Every structure is written in C-alpha cells, then in structure tokens.
Amino acid sequence: MKYSANLTALLQTDTVLVAVFEDGSLSPSAQQFDGQGEVSALLKSGDISGKIGEIATFRRQNQRIIVVGAGKPNDINERQFKQITQKAFQAVKPTSAQTLANALTEVQINGRDLYWNIRFGLETIAAESYIFDEFKSKKADPVKLRNVIFHADDKQAQLAVQHGSAIALGVKLARDIANCPPNVCNPNYLAAQAKKLEKQTALLTTAVLGEKEMAELGMHAYLGVSQGSKNEAQLSVMTYKNHPDPHAKPIVLVGKGLTFDAGGISLKPSADMDEMKYDMCGAASIFGVMNALVELQLPLNVIGVMAGCENLPDGNAYRPGDILTTMNGLTVEVLNTDAEGRLVLCDTLTYVERFEPECVVDVATLTGACVVALGQHNSGLISTNDELAEQLFRASQQTQDKAWRLPLSDEYQEQLKSPFADLANIGGRWGGAITAGAFLSNFTKQYRWAHLDIAGTAWLQGANKGATGRPVSLLTQFLINQCQ
C-alpha cells in the first residue's frame, strides 16, 4: 500500500473518508460533499449521529463517500482518534476501493498537530491492513486498496507520510519475523534477515558471531543458555553509518532474541508455551528499527544487535545450581534456567562496550513480573541515566507506544546476592521486573544505558493473537529526535 499527501485527490479517488461530529457539525470536506444535503440528510435521518466510530455511506457520482462519526469537536484524544481511524478503515476494507482520500486529517486531536494526525493515522491503517498467512494453504483475500492519500499538503504532511511509512514498514517486518514459527525462525534465521538487509543498502553492514567466536570472547553466560539446543546461537550485529562525522559515537540498540524459550530444565507450564516463540520480539523490533533507519536515512551512526539463542531442556542443558562466568568476569549462580534472557543480554551488553557507544538501549521480553506490574499497555523502562530515560519516555508519549519508568536503586541489588557467586540470576519473588533490570545494570557501567521490558506489549493473545511490532515506533521516534 502506498501513502501520500495532497489536496487534489478529494474528487479523484474512488473512496473518500469525511468526518461529522456529535453536535451536528460537518468537517470542511464533509461540507464539500454536502452540496445537495447528502451528509446532512444522514444526520437528520439518524443513520449517523456523529458518535465515535459510527459509519454511514452514500455514493456521489463515481465516488463512495464514507461518513465517520468523530465524537465531540475539539474534545478528541489519541485513543479516540485511533478508534475513529480503525472503524473507518474497517468500512473500507471489504469494498472494491483502490484509492482512498483520507480527510480525517481535519479532525482536531487534543494537544496534537497535523503531522501527528497523519503519521498516527497512517500507522493505524497499516496495522489494520496487516495479514500474516505465510503458513496457511488458503491465503486471505488481499486488501484491494492500493493508495491512501491524506488530505493535506504542506512540509509537515509530507514529513509525516515519510516517517509514518518507514515506521509502518519496520513494524510490519518486526511482526512478520516474530509471528514465524520457531521451527523456521531460529537464531540462524535472524542472522539471515540481518544479512539480507545488508544487501539492500550501502549504509549498513552486518557481522554475525557464532558460538566459536563467542567462546573466544568469554561469553559463557550467553553460551550456557544455548547448551541445550542443537541450533547454534548467533549474535547478529548490524552497523548503520550515516552521520556527517564518521567518528561520531554510535547509538547501540540490543534485542533479546530467544527464538524459543521452553524454560530449559526449569521447564515452563505447557499452557501457552507456544507463545514463547515471541521471546525474540526484542530482536525483531531492533530489526524493524534498522529497516526504518535505512528507509529514512537518518544522519546518525546506529548499531543494532540481535542476540539469537534458544533455551531448551536437554542432557547438555545448563542446570539450576550451575555457576557461569560472564564476559566481564562476574560469576552468576543459576537459580532458575528460565531466567535466561538476562544471561544472554549481560554478555551482549558487555560485548557492545567495544563500540564506545553514545548510549545503549536494550529491548527484551524479559519478565512476567513486568506484565503483572504494568499490564499490556505500557512497556517497562529502567535506566541508570535520567536524561536517557526522559528521552525514551518522551518518544513513547509522542508515539503512544507507551512506556513507564520503574525505579532502580541499590536496595534491589541486595536481592541478587549469592553465597557461591558474584550474582544470582533471580532476585526472589518481589519486584521481579526491577531486579532483572538491576542484574543487567551490573554490565552497563561503561555507558549510558536503558532497558525496555516488553513482555506485556510485544504480542497479543486471544482473537487478535500475534506480534504487535512494539516498540519499533518508540525507538524510531527516539532516533528521529536525536536529529533535531
């Protein structure tokens, strides 16, 4: 699907979206199509009242006019605008429409501008049109719509389309990878995707470390997790260089890539274990962000790292009670093999020191405790640097890819003490999301660091089961902000 913005398409597309409000008022474009009272008649007859998400349709010559209820004028928030856009697009999908003029750009959203309206609308439409049927013998009927033209034409509108299109593609690619079954998407598959991206642009190169290279570097915590799997662990490093100063320090993004996590010897319950293919959503999101970077060609140096691995029970699997030596020399007593993500990440976070980063942000489906604490709407944010934390929080608010900061203080380190090693890999029952972050902080002393726990936001359950692509939007916005 292609997206653009101009003011000339309103009378040229086969389908148009216009808004009406609860007080009976019409948006400017709705007024334009009310020349013979068609829109007003829908309101008078009660076919539509203007409440959020209501839909009514009429034809005018060769055009299909979809009238969308937009609630109370000048009192519409982001969540309501998303509902308006979703309902509108759901009305378009089953039709034969191929070109759509979207005049919902005229809906005013509290505290937001036209740029935000267009970009958020575009990302919402892209999400609503997402289909993943690669492994179905009978494919879903494709959406006939080919072009969406937003009714606006200034520099901010064009920028919104550019940013939104790149982010929407990044989200789609992240979802595609995450939704793949684990017998397809293993660590080698992640590495192959990174190598494929390298071939698409001169701005990005990819290097892949296998288990031999990791062993030489002393990444024994990472390798300990991988012991039970026949699929070799792979650390995929994507280096994007486009800063005017080639020596500028890179921003490093690290994604946990457990392509399947059975829990190891500390085996997970069988119920919903299939969802543990989503334990690589952190890595998938980093891949999506790097794709968005390539599309936008932002003037930055960024390194994206996907830490691919599997955690399976086997005669060679690591055990509760094992003590592993990490890359930075600290030893870790394994009390639970299902707290494996932090073991993969701690060595990866040590590895990226070599890049002398401006900052490091890791993304991981790390703890069920974070889901208990924050639910499925906000990712958990932990950081040792207030400025970096604020930058990420601001990006989350800009995009509605929400995150909420959790505390991190020395008291939580007390829970990680072990009588036999420098650290234990779990910190007991309380504050599990925070103690996981506290564990990681021991490996981030050389740079500014933040951690996003996406265990509650990376995928949906139930009827809409599947990966969400979060936090691609948040992280891409964070990078865009670095250029301003």
Curated annotation (Swiss-Prot):
Predominant location: cytoplasm
GO annotation, biological process: proteolysis
Reaction(s) this enzyme catalyzes, per UniProt: Release of an N-terminal amino acid, Xaa-|-Yaa-, in which Xaa is preferably Leu, but may be other amino acids including Pro although not Arg or Lys, and Yaa may be Pro. Amino acid amides and methyl esters are also readily hydrolyzed, but rates on arylamides are exceedingly low; Release of an N-terminal amino acid, preferentially leucine, but not glutamic or aspartic acids
EC number in record: 3.4.11.1, 3.4.11.10
GO molecular function: manganese ion binding; metalloaminopeptidase activity
Cofactor binding comment, as recorded: Binds 2 manganese ions per subunit.
Binding positions (Mn(2+) 2): K256, D261, D279, E340
GO cellular component terms, A-Z: cytoplasm
Binding site for Mn(2+) 1: D261, D338, E340
Keywords attached to this entry: Aminopeptidase, Cytoplasm, Hydrolase, Manganese, Metal-binding, Protease
Family to which this protein belongs: Belongs to the peptidase M17 family.
Protein's name according to its UniProt entry: Probable cytosol aminopeptidase
